[in-house]
Amino acid sequence: LADSDEGIINYSLQTIPDAPIYDIDGNYATIVREGYTNPNPIALAMLDDILLGRQKLTGNIFFDITPFENLTWRTELGYDISSSKADRYKPMVDLGGWKRSSNESGVQKNSSTFWQFKNYLTYNGNIDDHYFTAMVGQEAWESRYDFTSIFNTGLPSDEVHNPALGTGTPTINSGFGSSAMVSVFTRLTYNYADRYLGTYTYR
């Protein structure tokens, strides 16, 4: 949405500090000097439509069960589901020294999902001053994402922001991907009278 070198943020950083926002007639001003021409970033911020909508659902569910004394089973389920839609429309603009001769419109949609499932089985015990803990576990997760975008120029009206109606050459992009992992692990800890400690972990 920042539009790289032609975005509002970049133009704002490059605008000289004494540049006026409006001219004497109350219109948006553009400063043209020798070796320097930059559009009015305030004008672009007010005239361009840049919208980003996001939806997100995330959470974590867990429970502990103690079937026997000193033995605990813990299960965790986590998830994250998100989607977003970015709409960008730039109308034709004439700021005197700077012009945008063609309008342009772009839409991008993104979605992603993530889930994680864990199980732990832990046993705590002791014999006199010898304390020990044994744990075995399993973990699995998966992540997926996809996106589509379309961009075009030369729309017939500023009222309808639909790239499919543009007379220019449309630019269409899409992509997707996924990753996953499954692992098992164990951990042993030993404590003698709070004087000697030892831990062993394997995944």
Predicted segments, located by residue:
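Surface-exposed loop/interface segments of Gram-negative outer-membrane beta-barrel transport/assembly proteins
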Residues: 1-56, 74-183
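Generic recognition of flexible, low-complexity loop/linker segments
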Residues: 61, 123, 185-187
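Membrane-spanning beta-strand positions in outer-membrane beta-barrel proteins
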Residues: 62, 66, 72-76, 131-135, ...
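Outer-membrane beta-barrel channels and translocator barrels
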Residues: 66-68, 126-128, 193
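Extended, hydrophobic alpha-helical segments in both membrane/secreted and soluble proteins
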Residues: 75, 117, 182-188, 192, ...
